[in-house]
């Protein structure tokens, strides 16, 4: 007959030191206690009969119940943590050193992102970029290649091919600072191949499961069904990425091959397009231009009903912005339209003369159609109209006063001037992207009233007045004209740390240099530091 004291002594002999070994895993301790109680209850039942068994059963049941409750709580907490971790894995912050074009995390379930790596082992930043953010960052690095001696002999295609190789990255790493401030980013060239192999493996296993055949038979059947001269297609998961990359390359080859020589009053050097330059533009750009009155133009050019039907049917495309304002002049990018974008034909310059003095009506102050036939004006006109047609727009808004400016099909193209900015400005709802020498730029405009001083434009920092009267009307500048003439030190400060990038008393040599990527000497961030938001100017009053 076993001695009950021995079983109690066995309990006392159990290790329970002051370091809390039993308390490290609460659920495990409760489960162990329940098991010990059940064993002790069984021993007492065998020794003392039914009474002892009846007395031991409640103790064993209570201990076992406590252990089960603790284990259930632990399992529930673990499941909740796993679910939260799963949701967090589907998104990651964008790792671009520049400003994120989307302002939201990267959705890892989609196929529009790129992986990058930082050479800092303890980098806390993300390793994922939106595909568009990666292209913008890559284009900003390409701009800096023009300043490097060994890379000056490379063309754009060679720069893109060599950038992430060893010889190219040895030159480019200085422009690839990571947000952590202690490392440099680099494109993960192995990631896409690994992902592609995984997608192919998943597709192959999925097709074998669907057919219900052994893997060998399925592979042989696929080979038999495949045409002999037709190349093998890639996996369907790679199609969106391939389409986006092909579209990016085609746009850069067709549209971004040249920077046009729009005359800058400060002597900024113009650049001419290369020989054999071709532009992607609608056929009616080069054909005969028929006369069209304003009423007929508005009736044919406004496509409000297709927009409303598309919105009601849920056909909302990515990066699409719709404007149903009373003006109703804008034809936005909202899908595939059969009707080409139509631009207004300027009958005379009487409307422009109401905003400028008569002595300024000459080819120096206003870009004329006759002047365009002499130089590169025809290519410039096609470039602008092609970019607007691709975005389905025939009206632009002033960046300062937001006045609607119809675009004409002849010079002067607008009652104001157009310019390209490397940054996407949120103050303007629509976006007209275009590629210029491999750089992604955005087309904006300033109206003639803001340029000529009819509207008083002041800087919100120093309260000084902005003067745009020296700009040529009706043409396009290949840089941000609002950033080209900084009035105070605040316009030359870093966008991240707020410290001065350069001294305002020194400035830059050319107007276009203010629209280039600069590196802050204090925090090391690469950005378009001098391209400030349009809201940094204020329309104080209109005379």
Swiss-Prot record:
Residues 1-26, 197-283 are annotated as: Disordered. InterPro entries: Headcase (IPR026066), Headcase_mid (IPR031947), HECA_N (IPR054537). Residues 197-211, 235-250 have a biased composition (Basic and acidic residues). The modification Phosphoserine is found at residues 264, 268. Keywords: Developmental protein, Phosphoprotein. One of its GO terms (biological process) is negative regulation of mitotic cell cycle. One of its GO terms (cellular component) is membrane. May play an important role in some human cancers. May be part of the regulatory mechanism in the development of epithelial tube networks such as the circulatory system and lungs. This is Headcase protein homolog.
């Amino acid at each position: 007959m076993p001695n009950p004291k021995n079983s109690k002594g066995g309990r006392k002999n159990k290790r329970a030191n002051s370091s809390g070994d039993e308390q490290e895993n609460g659920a495990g301790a409760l489960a162990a206690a329940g098991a010990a109680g059940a064993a002790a209850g069984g021993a007492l039942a065998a020794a003392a009969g039914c009474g002892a068994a009846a007395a031991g059963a409640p103790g064993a049941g209570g201990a076992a119940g406590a252990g089960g409750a603790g284990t259930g709580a632990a399992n529930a907490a673990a499941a909740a943590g796993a679910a939260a971790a799963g949701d967090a894995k589907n998104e990651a912050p964008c790792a671009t050193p520049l400003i994120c074009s989307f302002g939201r995390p990267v959705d890892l379930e989609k196929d529009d992102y790129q992986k990058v790596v930082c050479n800092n082992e303890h980098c806390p930043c993300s390793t994922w970029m939106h595909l568009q953010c990666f292209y913008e960052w890559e284009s900003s690095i390409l701009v800096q290649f023009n300043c490097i001696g060994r890379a000056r002999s490379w063309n754009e295609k060679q720069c893109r091919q060599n950038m992430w190789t060893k010889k190219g990255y040895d030159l480019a790493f200085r422009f690839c600072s990571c947000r952590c401030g202690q490392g440099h980013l680099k494109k993960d060239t192995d990631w896409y191949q690994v992902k592609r192999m995984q997608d192919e493996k998943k597709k192959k296993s999925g097709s074998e499961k669907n057919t219900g055949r052994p893997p060998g038979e399925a592979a042989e059947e696929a080979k038999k069904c495949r045409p002999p001269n037709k190349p093998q297609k890639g996996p369907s998961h790679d199609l969106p990425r391939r389409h986006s990359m092909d579209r990016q390359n085609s746009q850069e080859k067709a549209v971004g091959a040249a920077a046009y020589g729009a005359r800058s009053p400060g002597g900024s050097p113009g650049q001419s397009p290369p020989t054999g330059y071709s532009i992607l533009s609608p056929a009616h750009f080069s054909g005969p231009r028929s006369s069209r009155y304003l009423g007929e133009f508005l009736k044919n050019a406004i496509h409000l009903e297709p927009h409303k039907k598309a919105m009601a049917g849920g056909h909302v495309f990515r990066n699409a912005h719709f404007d149903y304002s009373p003006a109703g002049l804008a034809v936005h990018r909202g899908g595939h339209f059969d009707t080409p974008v139509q631009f207004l034909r300027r009958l005379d310059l009487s409307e422009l003369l109401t905003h400028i003095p008569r002595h300024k009506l000459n080819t120096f102050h206003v870009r004329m159609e006759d002047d365009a036939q002499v130089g590169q004006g025809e290519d410039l006109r096609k470039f602008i109209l092609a970019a607007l047609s691709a975005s389905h727009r025939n009206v632009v808004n002033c960046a300062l006063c937001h006045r609607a400016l119809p675009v004409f099909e002849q010079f002067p193209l607008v009652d104001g001037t157009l310019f390209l900015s490397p940054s996407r400005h949120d103050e303007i709802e629509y976006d007209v992207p275009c590629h210029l020498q491999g750089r992604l730029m955005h087309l904006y405009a300033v109206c003639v009233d803001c340029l000529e001083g009819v509207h008083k434009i002041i800087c919100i920092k120093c309260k000084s007045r902005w003067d745009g009267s020296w700009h040529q009307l009706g043409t396009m500048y290949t840089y941000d004209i609002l950033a080209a003439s900084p009035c105070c030190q605040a316009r030359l400060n870093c966008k991240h740390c707020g410290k001065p990038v350069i001294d305002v008393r020194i400035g830059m040599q050319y107007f276009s240099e203010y629209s280039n990527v600069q590196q802050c000497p204090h925090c090391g961030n690469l950005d378009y530091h001098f391209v400030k938001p349009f809201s940094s100017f204020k329309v104080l009053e209109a005379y």
